[in-house]
Amino acid sequence: MMANQQATTPKHYSAYATLLDSFQSYLDAEKTYYKYFTSENPSVTVDEWCDKMYVDLINKINRVPFTSEAADRGTAFNELVDALVKKPLAKRAKDNDMESENIMLRVVVLQLKGRRKTDPITEKAAYEVVFDPDKDNRDRTASQPDEEKPQLREPQTFTFFKDVVDEFVTYYDGALPQVFVKGSLETHFGTIDLYGYADELMPFSCHDIKTTKNYHAGNFKEHWQHIVYPFCLHQMGVPVDLFEYNITNFKETFSEVYAFKEERDIPKLRDICERFIQFIETNRDVITDTKVFHSLNDR
C-alpha cells in the first residue's frame, strides 16, 4: 500500500521565466547556428555549438556563477533606472543620496570625438555608475582579517548617456520596480511553479528592460517573459495583459509589445513547460541544484 501511495504522489517542479528562455535557446540551437554562422569556415561546428548550448543550459539550471562585462553593464543600467524611478535625481542630489542597492551614481559630462579627425569634440551628459555586485558581502566582511575574507569581485564603472536613461525613467513614472510574480500551471507531468521579477509594473502593463549591443526587430519574440509574467499576474489577481520589452543598445531605445491571451498562450506555455520537465528528468544525473524538482514552497 505504501509503495502504491509513493508511486502516485504528484510531482512538483519550478522554473523562473528566463530559465525557460535559456531552454528555448537550447531547443533552437541548430536553427540559430545556421542563421549566424554563415561563413565557409565557421569557428565552431553545428555539433560543437549545440553542445555548448546544452552545457550553458545545465549550468544555468545548476546556478553556476557566470560573469561578463556585458551582463554587468546591463544589470548596472537596470539598477540605475530602478533607483531613479524610486527616487528622482533632483531629490537624490538634494538629499545627497547617490547610492542604491549595488550602485553609486553621479552625473558627468563626456567629451565625445567625431569619427573624423576634423569633427569637433561634442559634450554629452551621462550617468557614471560604480557597480559593485558584492557590496553586501564587502560591507559584511570589512572587519575580518584579509586572509579570512572571501574572494570578491572588484567594482566596475560604467557610463550611460543621460538622455537614454532619462527616457526609461520618464516612461516608468509611477511604476513599481522589481515586483516578484508567481503562478502555478498544471501539466501532464505534475504542477510547475513559474516565477520571476518584473522589472517595472505599471497599472495596465508589465515591462522588462533589455540591453544589447545589436538589436533587430522581434529579437524577443521567442522569449517567455511576455507570457509567464502576465500568466502569473492573472493568478495573483492583477489582470495585466500588456507586456513590453523596453530595449536599448545604450544609444537608442526600442520596444516590443505583446498582448497576453489565455486561450492562445496557456497551451503554448504548458507545452514548453512539459518539454522542460522531460528535459530535466532525462538529465537529472547532471543537475546538482535540485530547486527545479521542487515547488517554490518546498525549498
Describe the residue ranges of each PLM region.
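Metal-dependent nuclease catalytic cores that hydrolyze phosphodiester bonds in DNA/RNA
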Residues: 1-197
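Coil-to-beta-strand transition motifs
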Residues: 191-195, 202-204, 238, 251-253
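Short, structured patches in soluble enzyme cores that scaffold and shape functional sites
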Residues: 179-181, 210-211, 247
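Hydrophobic/aromatic-lined pockets within catalytic cores
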Residues: 81, 85-89, 211-215, 234-238
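Conserved catalytic cores of phosphodiester-cleaving nucleases, focusing on short active-site segments
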Residues: 77-78, 198-215, 229
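Active-site-adjacent loop/helix micro-motif of nuclease/hydrolase catalytic cores
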Residues: 215-222
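Metal-dependent nuclease catalytic regions and adjoining charged, substrate-binding loops involved
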Residues: 234-299
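An active-site-proximal "capping" alpha-helix that borders the catalytic cofactor pocket
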Residues: 223-234
